[in-house]
């Protein structure tokens, strides 16, 4: 129909419907006139607007895709950089310490759960619950771990003057080489203590694979603290002894 609105009549703008919230302007037939030339001009204007809108959406989509690719590339680069650093740290020469119990129960705290996260604290006790190490570690690359802080309560200030992993790797490695290493969550702990020649026995896997240390400790009446890494290592050892008898 070759009709257009009467000049100066704005019409009524409203949503198409609740599911397609796009504004459309409507006019009563009485508010329009027959004008083929103006209809042609209006159709051309709408076509140009639609094309411009489509080009803008396409450009925004491409920009978003590029941003995602760049972010993923940065993530991969961060993981590779950290892996190179950690591998170099654990390659250090170390002799096993004297450990007559033959057991090392270890617990760790980290900046998170992703491949680019780092150690914040390592604690270990021997089979008689004697402390072998309890050390804070300053992350080499990660400088923000708000989500992890809610769990482990280790702040940036807590590790500001702490040694880097490279400074304590030899000591940690010597301890881990001194006996049968156990941790409650082996897959998690191994990701951060990936020391050549060291295999970590997961206590959790000997139970059911999903019960947490806090829950199992309560079940057996074992003292437990979610923010004390040494307590976690001791609790892990006690659970291990119970399920091993």
Can you say where each PLM-predicted feature lies in the sequence?
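Short linear loop/turn motifs
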Residues: 2-15, 163-166, 226-236
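N-terminal accessory regions of nucleic-acid-interacting proteins
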Residues: 32-102
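Conserved non-catalytic scaffold segment of RNase H-like nuclease domains
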Residues: 85-198, 216-224
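C-terminal folded domains that constitute the principal catalytic or ligand-binding module
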Residues: 195, 213-245
């Amino acid at each position: 129909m070759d009709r257009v609105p009467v000049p100066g009549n704005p019409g009524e703008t409203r949503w198409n419907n609740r599911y397609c919230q796009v504004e459309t302007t409507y006019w009563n037939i009485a508010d329009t006139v027959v004008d083929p030339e103006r209809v042609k001009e209006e159709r051309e204007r709408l076509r140009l607007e639609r094309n411009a809108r489509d080009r803008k959406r396409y450009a925004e989509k491409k920009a978003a895709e590029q941003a995602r690719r760049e972010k993923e590339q940065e993530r991969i680069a961060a993981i590779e950089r950290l892996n190179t650093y950690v591998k170099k740290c654990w390659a250090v020469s170390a002799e096993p310490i004297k450990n007559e119990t033959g057991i090392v129960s270890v617990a760790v705290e980290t900046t998170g759960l992703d491949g680019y996260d780092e150690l914040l604290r390592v604690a270990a006790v021997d089979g008689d619950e004697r402390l072998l190490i309890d050390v804070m570690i300053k992350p080499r690359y990660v400088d923000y771990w708000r989500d992890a802080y809610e769990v482990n309560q280790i702040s940036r200030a807590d590790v500001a003057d702490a040694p880097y992993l490279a400074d304590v790797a030899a000591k940690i490695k010597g301890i881990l080489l001194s006996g049968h290493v156990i941790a409650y969550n082996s897959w998690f702990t191994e990701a951060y203590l990936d020391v050549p020649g060291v295999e970590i026995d997961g206590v959790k896997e000997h139970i059911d694979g999903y019960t947490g240390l806090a829950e199992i400790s309560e079940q057996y009446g074992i003292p437990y603290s979610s923010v004390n890494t040494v307590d976690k290592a001791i609790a892990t050892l006690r659970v291990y002894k119970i399920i091993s008898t």
